Swiss-Prot record:
GO terms for molecular function: GTP binding; GTPase activity. Gene3D superfamilies: P-loop containing nucleotide triphosphate hydrolases. This is Ypt/Rab-type GTPase Rab7. Ypt/Rab-type GTPases are key regulators of membrane trafficking and intracellular vesicular transport. They act as molecular switches that convert between GTP-bound and GDP-bound states, and regulate virtually all steps of membrane traffic from the formation of the transport vesicle at the donor membrane to its fusion at the target membrane. In the GDP-bound state, Ypt proteins are predominantly cytosolic, solubilized through the interaction with a GDP dissociation inhibitor (GDI). The keyword Membrane applies. A lipid is attached at residues 203, 205 (S-geranylgeranyl cysteine). The gene is RAB7.
């Protein structure tokens, strides 16, 4: 059996500033949490080697700035993405309401081959905060995800490391499926022109 080439999966993490994108990424890759992260300027990324269905892949996780003034940097960072993670804070209604805009922004900037089927995953972060402060219910988030084509949804806490590995396992699996479908369809990009010459001088037998 021939050895498979190494696979690099590019995953973009989007959401408003302060929802915990950097914390989620650091908890997943480095198993660390800090309450004093500075706002991401532009974009940053971390990598982690993971096994997806017996296949070794490298996850390249891009943490992009949530501030509007950096959204114009999007094209270069979004292109070639295999999965997009949309993050909001369950205690912040504005961050949840912004998910639609982040999703649309990604699809416009990244221009995936098959937009309706591009894999997204939604994370409702900061569930460690006391329940009384929560403003977005699980039901409301699930309804949003179902309306967008049954996007996988996880409620997470970067601080308490809740559902982090489970969420990123689904992210990795969906990203790999996307990468493989892109690879497959890429084999058929070049049209084949078949031109048949009429042999006018030949006999019509």
């Amino acid at each position: 059996m021939s050895s498979r080439k190494k696979v690099l999966l590019k995953v973009i993490i989007l959401g408003d500033s302060g929802v915990g994108k950097t914390s989620l990424m650091n908890q997943y890759v480095n198993k660390k949490f800090s309450a004093s992260y500075k706002a991401t300027i532009g974009a940053d990324f971390l990598t982690r080697e993971v096994l997806v269905d017996d296949r070794q892949v490298t996850m390249q996780l891009w943490d992009t700035a949530g501030q509007e003034r950096f959204q114009s940097l999007g094209v270069a960072f979004y292109r070639g993405a295999d999965c997009c993670v949309l993050v909001y804070d369950v205690n912040n209604a504005k961050s949840f309401e912004a998910l639609d805009s982040w999703r649309d922004e990604f699809l416009i900037q990244a221009s995936p081959r098959d937009p309706p089927n591009f894999p997204f995953v939604v994370l409702g972060n900061k569930i460690d905060v006391e329940e009384s402060k929560r403003v977005i219910s699980n039901k409301r988030a699930m309804t949003f995800c179902q309306s967008k084509g049954d996007i996988p949804y996880f409620e997470t806490s970067a601080k308490e490391a809740i559902n982090i590995d489970q969420a990123f396992e689904v992210i990795a699996r969906n990203a790999l499926a996307q990468e493989e479908s892109e690879e497959f369809s890429g084999d058929f990009d070049d049209p084949i022109n078949i031109h048949i010459e009429n042999d006018r001088d030949g006999c019509a037998c």
